[in-house]
């Protein structure tokens, strides 16, 4: 299992969400985040200079089976990519185990909805 963390533009979130659902990703979490990066700019508004170095993004957290890592990356990259600086990053992190709290199931089976237990 792997945890995929992706930091993407807020403006691309809906497209990425649709791409993940089309790629049969059943569940993921997301958060609005702010970050600092090389895209720092000073902007002038009504004669006052503002530092806009804090960048708004969306952070996605997805845990998938090993066989689903590449399709998940492809879905995110395909939907999030604009070709401009600041499109984001995708991180792939090993996951040692997963436990479904309700049933105690562990491993891959704990990742996905099981109609047997509903």
Regions found by a protein language model. Name each.
Residues 42-47, 97-114:
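Short, low-order "capping/linker" segments at domain edges
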Residues 51-85:
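Mid-chain, well-packed structural core segment of small domains
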Residues 3-42:
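N-terminal first-folded block
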Residues 116-118:
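Conserved small/polar residues in nucleotide/adenosyl-binding loops
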Residues 37-58:
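Short acidic, glycine/proline-enriched helix-loop-strand junctions
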Residues 2-4, 24-29, 56-60, 86-89:
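A generic structural signal for short beta-strands and their flanking turns/coil linkers
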Residues 77-106:
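C-terminal structural segments of small proteins and small subunits
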């Amino acid at each position: 299992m792997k945890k995929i963390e992706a930091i993407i533009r807020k403006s691309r979130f809906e497209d990425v969400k649709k791409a993940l659902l089309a790629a049969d990703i059943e569940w993921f979490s997301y958060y609005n985040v702010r970050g600092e990066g090389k895209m720092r700019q000073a902007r002038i508004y009504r004669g006052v200079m503002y530092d806009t170095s804090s960048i708004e993004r969306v952070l996605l957290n997805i845990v998938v089976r090993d066989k689903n890592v590449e399709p998940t990356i492809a879905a995110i990259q395909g939907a999030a990519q604009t070709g401009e600086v600041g499109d984001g990053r995708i991180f792939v992190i090993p996951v040692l185990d997963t436990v479904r709290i309700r049933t105690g199931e562990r491993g891959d089976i704990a990742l996905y909805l099981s109609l047997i237990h509903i």
